[in-house]
Amino acid sequence: MLAKDFLFMKNIRITIEYDGTGYAGWQRQAGSFCTVQGEIERILSQILQEDIRLAGAGRTDKGVHARAQIATFKSRSSLGPDRMVHSMNALLPNTIRISDPLVVPEGFHARHSAKEREYRYFVREEPSAVLGRFSGCSYGSLDLMSMNRVASYVLGEHDFSVFSKETRDRTGCLCRVISCKWFRQREFFVLRISANRFLRSMVRYLAALMIDSGKGLLSPEEAREMIESGILTRQLVPAAPNGLFLWKITYGSDSHSF
């Protein structure tokens, strides 16, 4: 038995920022797909000489970015957290950065302990060769008031299954949206939305619904009916992934708040 097998098993939490453009999403996948989780696990396993498996707070889709993804993993390594992160950043591609390493209580879990997740969606009215990597485009003017009227209807608990790629039965599709609002930030229209949980691609579908209302393609009342009835009255294409960021994860005081 190796000496390190006798070392105390630590639960380590890290914050991850990434440009999701070149990745097939966050979650590890079988085959040759390059994912953010897969890249970090590969480098961590190499550094710590252990088989490392991450648990992430959010499972972002292909092309979606993160400002502050949270992940936890277990390790027996004696390597200090700060030195570990320094080594990770030296070996990871420059599209992934790790920060704020912290040893947390055994019961803390990046996903299960999360109380609230915040996403932001950035969209411009005109395409940009430079900014397009990190923003969607409406290809036309947007009415902020109409978008925020629809945003107000999103608040509260709803079955969002029609606004997702979720394959589970409808009983698992209830989400409680805590905040939802659009604001202007220079040339961007920015959606800030937070909830206790999100379904797969849910933010992108809701962003598309609100953007369509802002373009005058559907009325806020029609959008409200779709949200409340759970029935789409027209085809809805999810907003482009490049405009979406996992922005913040909030934890309760009973499980550490970061």
Curated annotation (Swiss-Prot):
Keywords for this protein: Isomerase, tRNA processing
Record's protein name: tRNA pseudouridine synthase A
Binding-site list for substrate: 119
Main function: Formation of pseudouridine at positions 38, 39 and 40 in the anticodon stem and loop of transfer RNAs.
Family, per entry: Belongs to the tRNA pseudouridine synthase TruA family.
UniProt enzyme class: isomerase
Active site: 61 (nucleophile)
Organism for this UniProt entry: Chlorobium phaeobacteroides (strain DSM 266 / SMG 266 / 2430)
GO aspect biological process, one term: tRNA pseudouridine synthesis
Reactions this protein catalyses: uridine(38/39/40) in tRNA = pseudouridine(38/39/40) in tRNA
Catalytic activity, EC: 5.4.99.12
Xref: Pfam families: PseudoU_synth_1
Subunit architecture: Homodimer.
CDD domains to which the protein is assigned, alphabetical: PseudoU_synth_EcTruA
Any GO molecular function: RNA binding
